Amino acid sequence: FDPSYITKSGKFTHGIGYFYSGCSGKYERGLEIGNFSVIDVKQNTAYHLLATQSKYVKREKSTDDTLMDQYVELLKLTCKTILSISGVLVVDAYFCKNKYITACKDLGIECITRLRDDANLRYKYNGPTKTGKGRRKLYGEKVYFDRLDKRKFNLVHKNSEMKIYTCIANSISLKCDIRVAYVEFLDAKGNIKLTKKFMSTNLDRDGLSIVQYYRARYQMEFVFRDAKQYTGLEHCQARDEEKLNYHFNASLTSVNIAKGIARKGVKKDEEINISISDIKIELSNRLLLDLFISNYGIDPNLQKNRKIYNELLNFGKNAA
């Protein structure tokens, strides 16, 4: 799941307000859609599932209906569809909040996300217990990521790009135990250039798959990019809620159809390079060629025509 900012002018469009734009790094006037996508990890690509327009909530207005409440409500409405496809939901660090993580756990959905840089965690206590009255000790000392205790974090993956350490810890802000994947990204010399922390609500999840699933989430951004560039995601002039909803979902679904065309004849679990621009060019070429063939009475089944026909279908493509 990921929200996306949609540029839109006017005063009377449903839901228009100020939303965060990742491109400009600030709040801008326009619309926002909350989008669920299905990520095929083997194909390394995303397919649109559902887009719902967000309601604008003034930040200075005292109300219980925050944007996060809308995201939680949308999750509840969509959970049956999500669980019918996969039990794993991947979101970015913005959603690493108690309200959203708790909703995922209550709905039986495993949530994978990135922890904040200042995440406050504590180790689970596994030492000897005292006899006598009182509750047994549950938690140990605080987790200091700047001087990580690698006796408690296990190294589960290592290559030339990164090292992944994992541990079960308790999050004070999320009020639950989580599986933590601590990643050290390495430069060409093998020195640590960057560290990031990821988590899963599934305590049995391995650290490597947490990182792989989170990195696969970025395929959603390509769906937004392709829809904005090639299928008119931001070109709707309607102001009505239903018309806008239809347009957003139709535009994003068009990207799915284009990917389906590109993958025709390709094995289900095979990764390929897909250019939506090339697919649009091929479909336009096919339309014009069929028009010429129909009007000029050309037989496309002749051997020499079949070769030329296929060459002209690829005319103007950019991808190799």
Segments predicted by a language model, with ranges:
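Active-site-proximal, Lys/Arg-enriched surface segment
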Residues: 1-45, 160-163, 168
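Electropositive, glycine- and tryptophan-enriched low-complexity nucleic-acid-binding patches
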Residues: 22-86, 177-197, 201
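Short amphipathic alpha-helical "interface-anchor" segments enriched in bulky aromatics
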Residues: 1, 5, 143, 207-238
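An internal, acidic/charged active-site-proximal segment
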Residues: 56-184, 265-274, 306-310
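Basic, amphipathic alpha-helical segments enriched in Lys/Arg and hydrophobic/aromatic residues
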Residues: 235-291
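Short, conserved catalytic/metal-binding motifs centered on acidic residues
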Residues: 1-9, 36, 88-96, 111, ...
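Long, low-complexity C-terminal extensions of enzymes
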Residues: 273, 277-320
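Electropositive nucleic-acid engagement tracts
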Residues: 1-11, 77, 106, 112, ...
